[in-house]
Amino acid sequence: MDSTEQAAVLVRTAGLVVAVLIGALVAFQVLLAAGVPWGRAAYGGQAAELPANLRVSSAVAAVVWALFALVVLRRAGVTAWSPLPAAWIGPASWVLVGLFAVATVLNAITPSALERAIWLPVSALMLAGTLVVVLRG
């Protein structure tokens, strides 16, 4: 396998890892929106059961993150379809890098030890994987 093929495998693998992690995030957000009392691991860990406004926020976030997973998979060359036109995939991928960078910082400074323990490594992995996809893809 030459270096071009190795780079393509790396990018596809990174894209798949990011998509799986986003899938876990989407599932978590859907469960929060449904009222599962896991709020201590989200939104600063203020309440086990989220109030209605945060449940709605989780529902919206689940949809947005699912769409971003498709963008990452498209940028990584795993799928040919995404919810955005091809010309927007690059800029949207950089927006995602920015979101994961912010998420990593916020998860590092959250007052919730549980949220930090779960989501700091996840957000850092999503940031690293998305950077691989964007820079090498």
Show where each model-derived region lies.
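Interfacial loop at the N-terminal end of multi-pass membrane proteins
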Residues: 2-15, 33-58, 78-82
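Short helix-capping/hinge motifs at transmembrane helix termini and TM-loop junctions
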Residues: 36-37, 44, 75, 110-111, ...
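Mid-chain, well-packed structural core segment of small domains
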Residues: 71-106
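Membrane-helix boundary connector in multi-pass membrane proteins
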Residues: 102-119, 134-137
